Regions:
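RNA pseudouridine synthases
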Residues: 1-239
């Protein structure tokens, strides 16, 4: 598997992750497991010297779900990593995704609260803000479920207390599927996947949230926007 480098300077790298490739290893994984971080480290070994809260994740600034493809930012220095963490906390690190959905499914999955927002498809290009807290759900807590501010206390207690917002708009047709563009700053595991499924538009290939079967998950991180961690110049990198 080859590394697709999209941007490089002395402080950061931006790479395009293939679908079904883990971004980083788990703490318990062997060193031989193939991950995006491992591929990057072959060409840029210094990224392993950058260690945040999880030392085994190197300089990876943000993760994509294994099934998701697209842009990942990786710091080459400890200083750049610390600066990018501060940028994320200030909600200045924006990620943009494109998702495809062929099937409208208004029936909620178990554990989902009633959907309180507009349907992004019927808004025809108007931005719809879908917000929630999240709780882990199901066997081995592999899935997540949105939680609203007025949800029962026993559900609220299972969240981190952070409100997550996905801005979604319908952006046309691709083949037989509808395309939705999604933007967010702070993110939670499966956030885009869950928010779209909640709205009635599960992503193609997302069997976990009742999307139709497809070769890969039709979710691609197509752009990142943030101030450069050293120069502070605005950056927009897009594929």
């Amino acid at each position: 598997m080859q590394l697709e480098l999209v941007y490089e300077d002395h402080d950061i790298l931006v790479v395009n992750k293939q679908a079904n490739l883990p971004t980083v290893p788990l703490k318990t994984d062997s060193q031989d497991k193939l991950t995006l971080l491992g591929l990057v480290a072959r060409a840029f070994p210094e990224v392993l010297d950058v260690q945040g809260a999880n030392t085994w994740e190197g300089g990876v600034v943000h993760r994509l779900d294994t099934a998701t493809s697209g842009l990942v930012v990786i710091a080459r220095t400890k200083e750049a990593y610390a600066s990018l963490q501060a940028i994320q906390k200030a909600d200045l690190f924006i990620k943009e995704y494109q998702a495809l959905s062929r099937s409208y499914k208004p029936t909620l999955l178990p554990g989902f609260p009633p959907y309180p927002y507009e349907d992004p498809f019927f808004c025809k290009g108007k931005e719809v803000s879908i917000g929630s807290l999240f709780r882990r759900y199901g066997d081995h807590r592999k899935e997540v479920r949105p939680v609203l501010a007025d949800s029962p206390r026993h559900l609220l207690d299972k969240t981190t207390g952070t409100w997550y917002l996905t801005k979604v708009w319908y952006s046309g047709e691709v083949g037989e599927s509808h395309q939705f563009t999604c933007r967010l700053s702070s993110g939670f595991r499966h956030q885009v996947r869950t928010h779209l499924a909640w709205s009635g538009w599960p992503i193609d290939g997302d069997i976990m949230y009742e999307g139709i079967e497809a070769e890969n998950l039709a979710l691609n991180a197509v752009a990142v926007e943030f101030p450069h961690p050293v120069t502070t110049n605005p950056m927009e990198i897009r594929i």
